[in-house]
């Protein structure tokens, strides 16, 4: 049994005493110490991203005791929720079932794999309304899929929601004991001064390595343990297989087939010069009406990220998106490398130069999503395309990514001439810099954006 973050997280635990996801920085310590207004914390995230470890570690560090309930491994506990879901009743049941005293502020209650028990999810409403003094955290791997089912009564407005993503490159650097390198990268991102060439090359190698290993804790742990390349590949394949298993477990037969078909089409979708999702690449005659639900399932499961097209630059970007045109990206680089059979040696060879660009764009999509940005790209009459648009305060910033150091981009120039943004971002293997309104951001520093 792999303990997904045991060896990793202790190395930089003090640097991550908060969950940094979504549009806010939600500090778990602040949540614990809230005097009023605290609601149960509900953590979304793909399978094996580290949710269970985060919750149990938080309980061990900041509470006198923890009551851990896993609705997937213990079906019996879920039956008690069929009778009553008011908070006082649930507290009494948990105390008897686990033979432990639950004390407000001193006990953390964890509901794991809560999507397996509809009534437990609904009970969070009563913890929020009736007994806010109790500290409750819940999570589920397929939570996004589960709450989309009609039968679920989701506690709208009664929970604090947060999303966990795979470890980003900065977190992996921390895990490797390279905090000074990550700090230096952040410093040079801010001042736009080139990084020392030796450090620049070291950081680029870390980027290439990350593109293959990814950010799933099990894969990072195997990499840190210096497991053989075969063992590391097997772990990434295991993670991929767990995603595939979920497709059969949490969807009906018809939906499962279509989910598989969409997922299997992703390499071909991304290999095109124009990466807009095309249904015909799933199979001949495929239509949005047939496969829309399958795409939504993959998004809700945290397996893919969706990037919407915009043909205008105006703020807010989401108001001008074209819902019929989008791209899909893998949500983890290690899963992607396992799916396409990419190795570090192949990634750095000239034979895979074209696909290196695909990996780079997918990597940037993951990094932006992890930092809380909604994903959008810009296209103008099929003649010019900018990889990403991001909103920073009230500004819309175009982002172009290149796998190498050849950075001439006609589309970016078209965009800048048309909309005159405050500045643009170009991501490539080039060092930090700022010239002609374009901020040069090395590939390894996207976590700074």
Map each language-model feature to its residues.
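Interdomain motor-coupling "hinge/lid" segment immediately C-terminal to the ATP-binding subdomain
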Residues: 147-271
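Pre-Walker A adenine-sensing motif
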Residues: 2-35
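Structural recognition of the conserved hydrophobic beta-strand(s) that form the central parallel beta-sheet
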Residues: 110, 135-141, 163
């Amino acid at each position: 049994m792999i303990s997904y973050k045991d060896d990793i997280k202790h190395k930089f635990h003090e640097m991550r005493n908060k969950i940094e996801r979504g549009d806010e920085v939600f500090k778990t310590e602040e949540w614990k110490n809230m005097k009023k207004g605290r609601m149960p914390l509900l953590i979304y995230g793909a399978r094996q991203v580290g949710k269970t470890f985060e919750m149990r570690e938080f309980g061990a560090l900041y509470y006198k005791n923890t009551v851990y309930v896993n609705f997937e491994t213990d079906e019996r506990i879920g039956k008690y929720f069929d009778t009553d879901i008011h908070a006082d009743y649930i507290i009494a049941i948990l105390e008897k079932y686990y033979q432990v005293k639950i004390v407000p502020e001193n006990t953390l209650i964890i509901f794991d794999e809560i999507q397996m028990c509809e009534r437990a999810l609904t009970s969070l409403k009563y913890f929020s309304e009736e007994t806010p003094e109790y500290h409750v955290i819940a999570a589920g791997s397929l939570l996004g899929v589960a709450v989309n089912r009609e039968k679920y009564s989701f506690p709208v407005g009664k929970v604090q929601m947060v999303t966990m993503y795979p470890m980003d490159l900065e977190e992996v650097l921390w895990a490797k004991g390279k905090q000074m390198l990550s700090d230096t990268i952040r410093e040079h991102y801010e001042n736009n001064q080139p990084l020392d060439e030796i450090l620049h090359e070291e950081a680029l190698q870390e980027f290439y390595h990350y593109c293959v290993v990814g950010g799933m804790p099990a894969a990072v742990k195997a990499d840190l343990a210096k497991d053989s390349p075969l063992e590391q590949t097997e772990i990434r394949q295991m993670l991929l297989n767990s995603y595939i298993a979920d497709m059969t477990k949490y969807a009906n037969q018809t939906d499962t087939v279509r989910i598989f078909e969409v997922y299997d089409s992703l390499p071909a979708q991304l290999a095109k010069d124009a990466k807009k999702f095309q249904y015909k690449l799933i199979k001949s005659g495929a239509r949005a009406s047939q496969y829309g639900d399958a795409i939504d399932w993959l998004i809700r499961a945290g397996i893919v990220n969706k990037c919407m097209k915009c043909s205008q630059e105006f703020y807010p970007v989401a108001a001008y998106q074209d819902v019929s045109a989008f791209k899909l990206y893998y949500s983890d680089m290690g899963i992607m490398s396992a799916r396409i059979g990419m190795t570090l040696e192949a990634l750095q060879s000239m034979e895979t130069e074209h696909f290196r660009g695909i990996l780079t764009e997918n990597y940037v999509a993951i990094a932006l999503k992890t930092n809380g940005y909604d994903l959008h790209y810009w296209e103008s009459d099929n003649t010019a395309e900018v990889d990403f648009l991001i909103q920073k305060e009230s500004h819309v910033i175009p982002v172009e990514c290149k796998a190498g150091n050849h950075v001439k981009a006609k589309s970016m120039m078209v965009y800048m001439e048309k909309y005159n943004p405050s500045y643009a971002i170009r991501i490539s293997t080039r060092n930090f810099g700022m010239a002609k309104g374009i901020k040069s951001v090395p590939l390894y520093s996207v976590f700074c954006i």
